A protein has these predicted regions:
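Extended recognition/assembly regions associated with phosphoester-bond processing machinery
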Residues: 1-129
Length: 129
């Protein structure tokens, strides 16, 4: 068995707000559904953006986005919000939308543009635009 095959053998889905209505995936998909926080030391997989008392939270509910602008052009891009206690992960796809975010002082913004990632300078982080 290759490393790639092994990686695909265990899928964990942290239940979120839409799952109460949609329900768990069919059993034949072999997806294990878990409630938050799901411990994967040193990480906690969380649906909601939280700051845990211990561990590092990987959060997904917010679908953070940022507006970046140049002279005459602007774009809204998905972004990562990275801090000392948590990372808020972007959603990829048009169905989810993007939420304007306001990072905490200890958090950095890394925007996603196609296949490129770029960290925004702290002084240009205007996430409520």
């Amino acid at each position: 068995m290759t490393g790639e095959t092994m990686l695909c053998r265990r899928v964990r889905l942290v239940r979120g707000n839409h799952d109460a209505h949609a329900g768990d995936p069919p059993r034949e998909w072999r997806v294990t559904c878990v409630d938050e926080p799901y411990a994967m030391p040193p990480f906690l997989a969380c649906h909601h953006a939280t700051r845990p008392p211990s561990g590092y939270a990987l959060c997904g509910h917010v679908h953070p986005g940022i507006r970046v602008a140049t002279a005459g052009e602007s774009a809204r891009l998905p972004c990562f919000v990275l801090g000392r206690e948590r990372a808020i992960l972007p959603a990829f796809g048009r169905f989810t939308g993007l939420a304007d975010i306001a990072p905490m002082r200890d958090e950095r913004i890394v925007a996603v543009a196609g296949l490129a990632l770029f960290e925004l300078p702290a002084m240009s982080q205007n996430c409520n635009a």
